[in-house]
């Protein structure tokens, strides 16, 4: 079965300022690899050759990917005013048997090399201990999501990627086309929009270890994973700070 992927890369990631003044978060070098390039290579390794990347903020920084990896870029010029649902909307014609990814996630192991003989649609999830701000989920004995909450405690939560099969994609696309111009719908995360139609859209929980999918929330979070990040960030801002303070990058703290 042929599968494709849509990588969402339009956002600004303002919690990584000032570094995102120079380049988008998806272009950060982490442990010697560009985040989005690592993800593209993992998709290609799994046989997913049709890859669409939705760009917006500093879109020109991603142009080289077309020639280097043969990906298809889709421009979302309204990234600053709208949620990532709108990025899926501008890529809606490509939704089929599709992985939905974010450019700035780091998959320790390749999650796209998998067994899914029934081709079910799923959302990657992990168990969080304590309070969290991600989308929490409740699910049935059959592992079908039955409720979505914003934040939670000591429960399963959405993390990383999702997979839509062709039937799910057709329904999701239809709902987007019907509702995208309604008040505040375009401002939503796609997960919020899915939650509105949860009874009509069956999405399974696929559990991952909480150390296998990383979503860096800030610079210090990233540095805990890659202690050499500031040495490899290729930032004029860091260079200027080091010049003024006469220090090396790893001596800089928040």
Locate the predicted segments by residue:
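Conserved alpha/beta core of the MobA/IspD/sugar-nucleotide pyrophosphorylase nucleotidyltransferase superfamily
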Residues: 2-5, 157-253
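Conserved core of the sugar-phosphate nucleotidyltransferase
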Residues: 108-184
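Conserved beta-loop-beta/alpha segment of the NTase-like Rossmann-fold superfamily
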Residues: 63-135
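Residues at the starts of beta-strands that form the adenosine-phosphate
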Residues: 4, 49-51, 97, 202
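N-terminal nucleotide-binding beta1-loop-alpha1 segment
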Residues: 1-21, 70
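Nucleotide and nucleotide-moiety/phosphate-recognizing core
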Residues: 30, 45, 51, 59-66
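Short catalytic helix/loop segments, enriched in acidic residues and glycine
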Residues: 22-37
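A short, N-terminal amphipathic alpha-helix
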Residues: 33-50, 90
């Amino acid at each position: 079965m042929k599968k494709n992927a849509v990588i969402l890369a339009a956002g600004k990631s303002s919690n990584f300022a000032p570094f995102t003044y120079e380049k988008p978060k998806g272009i950060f070098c982490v442990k010697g690899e560009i985040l989005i390039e690592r993800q593209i290579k993992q998709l290609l390794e799994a046989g997913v050759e049709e890859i669409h990347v939705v760009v917006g903020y500093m879109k020109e920084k991603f142009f080289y990917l077309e020639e280097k990896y043969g990906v298809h870029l889709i421009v979302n010029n309204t990234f600053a005013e709208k949620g990532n649902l709108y990025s899926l909307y501008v890529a809606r014609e490509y939704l089929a048997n599709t992985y939905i990814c974010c450019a700035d996630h780091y998959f320790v192991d390749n999650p796209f090399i998998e067994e899914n003989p029934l081709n079910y649609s799923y959302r990657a999830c992990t168990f969080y201990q304590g309070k969290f701000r991600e989308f929490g989920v409740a699910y049935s004995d059959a592992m079908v999501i039955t409720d979505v909450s914003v934040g939670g405690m000591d429960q399963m939560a959405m993390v990383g990627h999702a997979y839509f099969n062709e039937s799910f994609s057709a329904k999701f696309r239809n709902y987007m086309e019907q509702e995208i111009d309604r008040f505040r719908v375009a401002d939503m995360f796609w997960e919020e929009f899915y939650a509105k139609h949860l009874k009509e859209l069956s999405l399974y929980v696929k559990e991952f270890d909480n150390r296998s999918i990383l979503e860096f929330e800030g610079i210090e979070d990233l540095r805990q994973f890659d202690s050499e990040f500031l040495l490899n960030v290729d930032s004029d801002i860091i260079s200027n700070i080091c010049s003024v303070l006469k220090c090396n990058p790893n001596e800089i703290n928040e």
